[in-house]
Amino acid sequence: MADTVQTGQPRTPQLVRAASLVNAAQIAHDTEVRQSSNGVSFATFGETGLADLDLDRMLETVPTAITAALKANTYYFVPLALREAMAENSEAGADNAEALLKSELAAEPTMVASAYTDEFSDAAICHRNVELGHGRRGVFISTRLMGDRFALSFEFFINVAHAFVDQAGTPEVFADLAWKQALGGVRGETSIDAWETRNLAFGRPPNAQPEPTPVASRRNRGFASFSARQRAFASDDAATAVVGQVNAPSPLAPIDPQSSINDKERALYLEAAFSDAVAIYLLSLALDFDYSELREREYPLLSPAALAARLRVVAELYPPNPGYEFAVKYRRRA
């Protein structure tokens, strides 16, 4: 369970009687910060709708090898964090440096709604990062904007993964695997960032769809697809990614490794792919999910077999905490 980090006089819990807007920096100043058993600093404010057991389970999913890189971050779970609002002069032209500076200074502070309302929900965003000074950052996550535990967990894990990769970088063993897959023309990717930077690395337009290579026969070919039953978030059972066999689409044309490669975009691609893999790995530890739930319109999903290979590398680098388990199981769909 989480322990309180004592910073001065004990603070009494805040009772929220009606929805109101509060400066995020003020929340960070006034709200008690706690620490999960694996070292994640966090706090809650307002009517989050989160049960303590569910929150603890989500926080404690993060392996201690990853939380060591999160010391500068405190995760604030709030009902709604509002989108950035700028003063009227924020549209000053970029060629006017003085006006642009004034525009930036005129930015309103990050505001948080203490409870859910339709009006505040329309103005909310999934999360806001707030610099708190002295190298500290507050990540304010909108718990009431997420449709379910899956969405909230993934939002949290995405933020954790980005912060971790910013500090730790991309391991060579993962970079080698992901780049080999990209050179081999593996289908799809794990995020729009990974999809676009991978295309740009090979000199293609960011939204390019590579042509498939013809194959002589597709009979008896198989393709792994993640599928799992979703269960109660607070369950103590270890989460497992279940993989089924279905017919494979045609593979994409492999890339000539001697062709011109944009090294900057390649580095950005590998960073995005690793961050995505860490987030999906954490999600698989927290709860069961169907791989199709990660599907987006802007790009095709990475082939499940390729994703499984990436996740295994992440699991070897950052083993699960006690009470959590990572596994990939295969089954043939009838």
Predicted regions: what is each one?
Residues M1-F150, L317-A334:
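A metal-dependent hydrolase signature that marks the N-terminal structural subdomain at the beginning
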Residues M1-S37, Q230, A239-A334:
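Pan-zinc metallopeptidase signature
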Residues R149, S153, F157, A267, ...:
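Hydrophobic (often cysteine-bearing) scaffold residues that line and stabilize catalytic clefts
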Residues F150, F154, D166-R219, D290-L301:
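Post-HEXXH active-site segment of zinc metalloproteases
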Residues E155-A168, A277:
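Catalytic glutamate of the conserved HExxH
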Residues N199-D263:
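Short amphipathic alpha-helical segments and their helix-coil junctions
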